[in-house]
């Protein structure tokens, strides 16, 4: 969370609350990452997500984002839907990003991994701003479980197919 103000100005604060995404990795029984476009058996074209009655096919964003030429503290987070990308050189599929300022109350996202395999995500985000103080309560669960840190990625859901 970034805040900006003039020390003399008590009541005028600007808060920039970054967005967030749900991250997914699907491994086969041999441990191959099926979210990797370079994996011969990847399932990127088979998966989809349904949110608010809209079904999203996986967009290919792998390797297209580069660090901006100029540093900024602004967090622009347009909603992209379902996409494959990489985090610290590990391919994954993300859903979102959800706007950090928006309140979500157990919103449901159904992830379809193909072959009749579905998982249900629940997304919550509550932001309370009181002057210069910001309180954020955020949760993304899948089938009732919290995400884990593994394979070099933070907050990711790992499935075996």
Report each predicted region and the residues it spans.
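Short amphipathic, basic-aromatic surface patches that mediate peripheral association
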Residues: 26-40
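Short, solvent-exposed beta-strand/turn "edge" segments of beta-rich domains on protein surfaces
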Residues: 11-17, 34-38, 98-100
């Amino acid at each position: 969370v970034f805040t900006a103000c003039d020390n003399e100005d008590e009541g005028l604060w600007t808060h920039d609350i970054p967005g967030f995404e749900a991250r997914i990795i699907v491994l086969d029984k041999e441990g191959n990452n099926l979210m990797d476009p370079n994996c011969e058996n990847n399932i990127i074209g088979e998966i989809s997500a349904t949110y608010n009655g809209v079904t999203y096919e996986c967009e290919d964003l792998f390797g297209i984002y580069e660090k901006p030429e100029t540093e900024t503290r602004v967090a622009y987070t347009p909603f992209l839907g379902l996409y494959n990308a990489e985090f610290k050189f590990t391919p994954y599929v993300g859903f979102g990003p959800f706007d950090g300022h928006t309140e979500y109350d157990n919103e449901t996202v159904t992830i379809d991994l193909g072959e009749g395999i579905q998982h249900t995500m629940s997304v919550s985000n509550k932001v309370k701003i009181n002057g210069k103080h910001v309180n954020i309560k955020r949760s993304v669960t899948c089938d009732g479980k919290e995400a884990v840190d593994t394979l070099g990625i933070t907050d990711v859901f790992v499935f075996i197919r």
